[in-house]
C-alpha cells in the first residue's frame, strides 16, 4: 500500500498555481498526485481512496473539483472519495489538499 498526503497547488518551485481558483488548484494538486504516484512506480489507476479537503466548501467548489476528478480518473472504476470542508489549510492561499491511498500490484 502507498499513502500520499499533502498534495496541493504548489508547482515544482513552490509557487501556488490558481491562487483564487479551486478549479486550477485542483488541477495542479491532481497533477502533483500523479507525479507522486509515478515516483512510487504506480499510476493514478492504483489509487483506491481519496480524501479531498476544500476550504470554505460551497456548491461551486464541488462542481469544480468534480470536473477535475472526471478529467483525471476513469468513470468506470473511480477511487472512493471523501470530500471534507475545512476552515483553512497549511498555507492561507491553499484552497484544496488531497490525500490518497493506493494499492500497487
Give the positions of each predicted feature.
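Short, polar/acidic, helix-capping and beta-turn segments at strand->helix junctions
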Residues: 1-105
Amino acid at each position: 500500500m502507498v499513502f500520499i498526503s499533502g498534495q496541493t497547488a504548489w508547482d515544482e518551485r513552490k509557487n501556488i498555481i490558481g491562487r483564487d481558483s479551486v478549479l486550477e488548484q485542483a488541477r495542479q494538486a491532481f497533477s502533483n498526485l500523479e507525479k507522486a504516484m509515478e515516483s512510487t512506480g504506480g499510476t493514478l489507476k492504483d489509487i483506491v481512496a481519496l480524501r479531498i479537503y476544500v476550504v470554505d466548501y460551497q456548491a461551486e467548489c464541488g462542481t469544480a473539483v468534480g470536473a477535475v476528478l472526471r478529467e483525471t480518473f476513469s468513470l468506470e472504476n473511480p477511487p472512493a472519495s471523501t470530500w471534507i470542508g475545512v476552515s483553512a489549510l497549511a498555507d492561507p492561499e491553499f484552497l484544496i489538499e488531497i490525500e490518497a491511498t493506493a494499492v500497487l500490484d
